Amino acid sequence: MLSKVIRAAATAFAIGTAAIAVAGIALTVPAQAAVRSAVGKPLNEAKSLAASSSYSAALARVSAAEAVPNLTPEERSVISAMRQYIEVKSGTGSLGVKAKFANDYNAKRYRDVINDGELLRKNGGLDASSMQIIAQAYYLLGDYHGCSRYIMNNFGNGGGEEVMKLQMRCAYESQDNESMRTALETLVARTNKPEYWSQLLNAAQSTKGLSDHQTLDIYRLKLLTGTITKADDYNLLAQLALQLGFAAEAQAVIEKGIAAKVLSGDRTTRLLTMAQKQAGANAAKSAAALAAANASPNGDALVKLGEDTWGQGQGHYPDAIKLIQQGLQKGPTDKDNALIRLGVAYYSAGQKDQAVRSFEKADGDAKQKIIAHLWAIFARTH
C-alpha cells in the first residue's frame, strides 16, 4: 500500500515537453549596414558559401573580413553577426551548438539531444538548465534508468525542485519505490512545501500495522505542516489524542480547528466539552499521577505523563522534557517511543539539534523508525 501511495504521488508530477529557445542567436542572415567594400565583399561571399552549406569556407571569408585594418564598430558588429549566423546554421561553435541543442529538442530528436551534451561541454555551454533538458530527453526516450543515472552523475543530491520531480518520476516508471521515497523526502527537505509534505505523510500513513499512537504522530505532523484542511482530519486528530489520554492536546486541536473556521456545529461542541472536561480532570489529579508514575516499576507512565504535559503547550515543554528523561532513565518498555517523545518535546522547546539526535536514536522497530524519521525531517526543515 505504501508503494501505491508514493507511486500516486509520482504520477502527479507531469513531464513537460515545451519548446526551448537559445537567447541571442541569429537565425536569419544578418542585414549588412554601410561597410567598406573590403569588408562587404568577403561577407557576401561568406553568405553565399553558407547558403550552399560550405561552412568552413564561409567562416574563412568571415575571418578575411575580420582581417581588414581599422574596422569600425559597425563593421565589427556586422562581422560578428555573420559569424554567429554561420555557426548557428552549421551547428558549430558555442552558439551553433546551443542552437542545434534547442532545435533537436524542439524536433523531438531526443537521442541527438543527449549526444549534444558532449558538444555543449566542449564549447562551455553545458549548464544546469541544459543538463536538466538532457535528463528529460532520457525520460522521454523511455530510458528511465539512464535518466536517473544522468541526474545522479551530474546533480547528485544538489538538483533543484524540477530535477528532483523528474528523478521521482523516473523512479516511478522503474518501479523503484525506495528511490521514489528518497526523491519525495528530498523535495520535502528542499522546498518544505505543504503539497510534498502531504504526499510524504499520506505515504507513511498507508504503512500496514501502524498503531493509533503512530497514526496520531502523523496527524500531529499534518497539523504542523499545514496539510490539515478538512474537518474530518481535525476531528480524527482530536479523537486520537483524547483516546490515548492527551486531553489538553485534543482541546487545543479543536480550538485551532474552530479558529481556522473548519470546525463548527454540535459535534464540535460536544467534542470540545469532552476534551475540556477530561483535561480538567487530568489537571486535578496530576500530583497523584506523578506519584504513581514514580512508583511504577518502569518508565512508561513517566513518558506518557511527559507527553501529556507537552500537549499542554507553550510553557510546559521544559517539564515535559524532564519527565520523559526520567522515564528513559527508569527504563520504558518502548524505548523508541520514549525517544520520539523526547525529540518532540526538545523541538517544541526550541532545542532542534537535541531533537534530531533523539529522533535518530529511535532506530529499533521499523514503524517507529518511520515516525522518528518524519519528525527528524520536520525538525530540520522548521
Model-derived features with residue positions:
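Generic helix N-cap/helix-start motif at coil->alpha-helix transitions
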Residues: 34-44, 73-79, 89-99, 109-112, ...
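Conserved small-residue packing positions in alpha-helical repeats and bundles
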Residues: 46, 84, 101, 135, ...
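Residue at a conserved register position within TPR or TPR-like alpha-solenoid repeats
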Residues: 49, 87, 104, 138, ...
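C-terminal soluble interaction/assembly domains
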Residues: 298-382
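N-terminal leader/linker segments that initiate helical-solenoid repeat arrays
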Residues: 4-8, 13, 22-110, 115, ...
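Long, contiguous interaction/recruitment modules in multidomain scaffold/adaptor proteins
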Residues: 2-5, 9, 13, 18-35, ...
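Structural motif corresponding to the intra-repeat A-B loop/turn of tetratricopeptide repeats
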Residues: 52, 90, 107, 141, ...
